[in-house]
Amino acid sequence: MSDRHEDGSGATAAQDTQDAHAAHDAQDAVEQAWHGVVATARRTAAEGLVVGTSGNVSARVGDLVLVTPSGVPYDRLGPGDTVAVDLEGRQVLGELTPTSELPLHLAVYRNSDAAAVVHTHAVHATAVSTLVPEVPLVHYAAAMLGGPVRTAAYARYGTQELADNMLGALRDRTGCLLRNHGTVTYGSTLDEAYDRTAQLEWMCRLWLTASSVPGHSPSLLTRAQLEEVQDALKGYGQPG
């Protein structure tokens, strides 16, 4: 009897240790993700993609979504300000109120394999959102976002209607414009999501610049040319 009891105690102790390690790893993952969210949000401000407390950034860790809070300057956020919700939007970490654009972020995570979302009010992209239903193919960088970038119909910020409009524009894409509002991009990492935002803003600036020359219209790529680039991009970057 004593041997069986000791064996059971040993198994229980081993399981407790394993659970403790798993909990520690999960906590580390959350802390690292929050650090990345804050760093990326600060980067959007530093590089002029947002003004003040506008825009928002999120990252997914398992069934948790870590997201910037509403109305708090990014340079004031620290390790103790973690804000996290579940995929239904219920807050599970932190005391600060999540961003008002939470429906937008959750819609992306529920309908894609995204691990990060970046939303900005980048000035050139927002300007283009007021002009066209789709960003003209002025550069092959559009391939990095899955194809010609669409403009989602306008709806008030923070609404499910806006989130639904965004999903339509994101079909087979990793980024879109929000009419009279800004940009949304997502990726498998925060760096990838941010890079797609930067590429989108740059393309919009390029098109506005080329379009402003009197008496000339920018030459545009064909869909076939863009598809050729998409094929070439499959081998882009470092292996592994």
Give the positions of each predicted feature.
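Glycine-rich flexible loops
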Residues: S2-T12, D16-G240
